[in-house]
């Protein structure tokens, strides 16, 4: 949360670069970039750091989510994730913030006290497909969300920030 937006933009660039490079590798089915902040969540390093997990399969939770998005698309012709975001925008009750490129909202069935989902306004499948403005907007939103979360506590909060991607096409 203390990093300037320009440094968080570097994190977004790293996610996008690694996604693009790993996507070229044979046998990779799921890419999972994430950042860890704080020993409270079980990290062994005291400083914030990122990693990228790459799987030769789609993890069970992601597989289930893909099945739901595909079934929804077959039934309605729509994009489940986009329709959820639009419903959240219409209701307006759980919107945390919005900028030109992204919407941050608390999901209806949040599993954690400070859980926030960040969704792109434009249909994109992977981080490397983001344009320059979207990358800056994501870095800016990420900064604001971290600061808002930390405002609830006397110490910085420990948290993971994750983006699950898959090589399978999601119906847009």
Regions found by a protein language model. Give the residues of each.
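HIT superfamily nucleotide-processing domains
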Residues: 1-172
């Amino acid at each position: 949360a203390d990093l300037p937006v320009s440094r968080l933009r570097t994190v977004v660039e790293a996610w996008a670069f690694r996604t693009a490079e790993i996507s070229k590798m044979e046998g990779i089915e799921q890419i999972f970039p994430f950042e860890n902040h704080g020993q409270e969540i079980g990290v062994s390093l005291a400083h914030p750091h990122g990693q990228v997990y790459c799987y030769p399969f789609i993890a069970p939770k992601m597989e289930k989510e893909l099945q739901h998005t595909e079934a929804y698309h077959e039934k309605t012709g729509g994009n489940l994730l986009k329709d959820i975001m639009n419903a959240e925008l219409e209701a307006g009750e759980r919107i945390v913030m919005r900028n030109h490129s992204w919407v941050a909202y608390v999901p209806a069935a949040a599993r954690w006290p400070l859980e926030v989902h960040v969704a792109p306004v434009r249909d994109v499948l992977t981080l490397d497909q983001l344009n320059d403005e979207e990358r800056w907007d994501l870095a800016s939103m990420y900064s604001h969300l971290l600061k808002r979360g930390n405002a609830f506590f006397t110490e910085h909060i420990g948290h993971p920030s994750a983006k699950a991607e898959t090589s399978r096409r999601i119906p847009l």
